[in-house]
């Protein structure tokens, strides 16, 4: 798929509509705020610390992960195709005094002049929102330095993930707006690893994240049957 066509306008519009609530801790993005400390810790620990490292956050949205990485000393570029989320991200960074370079671009186009440029690349909850995940994964691989880390997170595709993520989170618990996810776009871990294997990345770890609706707490789990992250490293 051509680099400029790997964007779903409906997906962009979906997050444009929700942009103004991005930093509302009790709003539509509350799950991302609750989940973010686990993601940040996993990235920082697995990459051997990101302080002083060049990091790219692909599909950064309103900047929740980008800001948290910048706060612990990473030099962060945030990449997204949504005008409203990027505007929210820039404003919030300005208000909080965090230095982040936000760019409107696709991963594929950004990679053209950022070959082997970053120490760490993150692509969280983004692959299930693009027409061609393989194209994004290849671009992420191209942009990370040899020996550098690329992190992906997405949602497994099975009955349990449909019940938890769509019926539960969207319809019953109202944690997310109805229509945030499409089950057919979810990606099985085996499929994601196969896509990774088509590049110079090697999967080094996989970790699940579970949510307890009674306590409102996310935690790590070895089970990758719903939400999961993988760590990959580029071959030297």
UniProtKB/Swiss-Prot annotation:
Catalysed reactions, semicolon-separated: a 3-demethylubiquinol + S-adenosyl-L-methionine = a ubiquinol + S-adenosyl-L-homocysteine + H(+); a 3-(all-trans-polyprenyl)benzene-1,2-diol + S-adenosyl-L-methionine = a 2-methoxy-6-(all-trans-polyprenyl)phenol + S-adenosyl-L-homocysteine + H(+)
Binding locations of S-adenosyl-L-methionine: 39, 59, 80, 124
Entries under SUPFAM superfamilies matching the protein: S-adenosyl-L-methionine-dependent methyltransferases
InterPro entries: SAM-dependent_MTases_sf, UbiG_MeTrfase
Involved pathway(s): Cofactor biosynthesis; ubiquinone biosynthesis
Alphabetized CDD domains for the sequence: AdoMet_MTases
Gene Ontology MF, one: 3-demethylubiquinol 3-O-methyltransferase activity
GO process terms (BP): methylation
Entry keyword set: Methyltransferase, S-adenosyl-L-methionine, Transferase, Ubiquinone biosynthesis
Protein EC: 2.1.1.222, 2.1.1.64
Function: O-methyltransferase that catalyzes the 2 O-methylation steps in the ubiquinone biosynthetic pathway.
Family statement drawn from the similarity comment of this UniProt entry: Belongs to the methyltransferase superfamily. UbiG/COQ3 family.
Protein name (Swiss-Prot/TrEMBL): Ubiquinone biosynthesis O-methyltransferase
Species annotation: Shewanella baltica (strain OS155 / ATCC BAA-1091)
Taxonomic lineage of the native organism: Bacteria, Pseudomonadati, Pseudomonadota, Gammaproteobacteria, Alteromonadales
Name of the gene this protein is made from: ubiG
